[in-house]
Amino acid sequence: GLVIRHLPRHDEAVLRRCEAAGVATLHEAWDRQGLMGPAIRPIQQGVSRAGNAVTVLVTPGDNWMFHVAVEQCRAGDILVVAPTSPCGDGFFGDLLATSLQSRGVVGLVGDIGIRDSQTLR
């Protein structure tokens, strides 16, 4: 896989304004582009986050690049995980959540299977 180590970062003030505006407002402001599919749902309701996105493309059944992406994350980031094909594998659980939390990552968005959801809540 390809790893980009020096990611462009947005200004903290811009991120805070985005967080305050909310998803629906941002979606409208960006000509209704970039909204995730309706099957991607939060496991924790009522939480709003904005941060720099660290993106990773994963192959179902292989979480190596997921771990590589975690190493690229900084405090305030959001990890965005997309599989190369439909995947219900439990890629993410409490162990990776602890790793992200120790790096200060504020969220994860993914079209992937999540395990340990009760613990993560």
Predicted regions and their residues:
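Feature captures the catalytic cores and cofactor-binding loops of soluble hydro-lyases/lyases
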Residues: 1-121
